């Protein structure tokens, strides 16, 4: 296993409440913001977090391996200033067969995403997906250290799956819209229609009821 060169984040970003400007990435799926000069490289044998093999202040898809001749780590920044995303993309990584994952840093929100993107039907990743602050503080996705892929083999984003990490204290009541599931093209003569969608609960309290408003073509909210 090896580390990449030190890379610069192309916008202001805070990790665990503190500003960070640079990172490096291991060929075993670990991105670290600290001790950039000479940290030991984590091996491909992943484990539950926290783990002493992982440097402080790290994000990881630990357990994938950049051992193939066409296994690469690519970076690209998307969006406009103020709301950009910086993607660190593990392409064609080895996990039984080819496997694609990304770590994403988001400007403005300081959110971190781990994106499960695309896999061969023969791939069998068993990864630790999460964040380690130090030797005693870490969080990992349920299922780690044997977290399997959810995304299929499509090169399109339609079957991608992601895990979102938000800094701060969890609100008791919080929700976000995921999708509008009503068919986008409707014949008015067939009205009335049922407006449907999906929401996700981001709060600690169970949601038992809510008010939902919507507008059509910029009209008054209903």
Where are each of the predicted segments found?
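Extracellular/luminal regions of secreted and cell-surface proteins that mediate adhesion/ECM remodeling
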Residues: 169-222
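Extracytoplasmic Ser/Thr/Pro-rich, glycosylation-prone low-complexity segments
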Residues: 1-173
């Amino acid at each position: 296993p090896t580390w990449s060169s030190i890379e610069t984040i192309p916008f202001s970003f805070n990790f665990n409440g503190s500003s960070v400007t640079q990172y490096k990435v291991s060929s075993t799926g670990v991105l670290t913001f600290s001790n950039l000069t000479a940290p030991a490289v984590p091996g491909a044998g992943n484990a539950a977090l926290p783990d002493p093999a992982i440097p402080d202040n790290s994000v990881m898809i630990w357990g994938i391996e950049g051992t193939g001749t066409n296994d690469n780590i690519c970076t690209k920044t998307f969006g406009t200033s103020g709301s950009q995303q910086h993607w660190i993309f593990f392409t064609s990584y080895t996990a039984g067969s080819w496997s694609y994952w990304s770590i994403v840093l988001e400007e403005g929100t300081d959110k971190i995403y781990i994106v499960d993107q695309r896999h061969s039907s023969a791939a069998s990743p068993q990864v630790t997906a999460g964040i380690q602050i130090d030797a005693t503080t870490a969080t990992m996705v349920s299922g780690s250290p044997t977290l399997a892929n959810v995304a299929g083999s499509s090169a399109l984003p339609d079957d991608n799956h992601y895990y979102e990490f938000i800094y701060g204290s969890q609100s008791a009541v919080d929700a976000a819209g995921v999708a509008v599931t009503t068919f986008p093209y409707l014949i008015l003569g067939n009205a009335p229609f049922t407006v449907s969608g999906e929401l996700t609960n981001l709060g600690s309290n169970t949601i038992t009821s809510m008010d939902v408003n919507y507008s059509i073509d910029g009209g008054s909210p209903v």
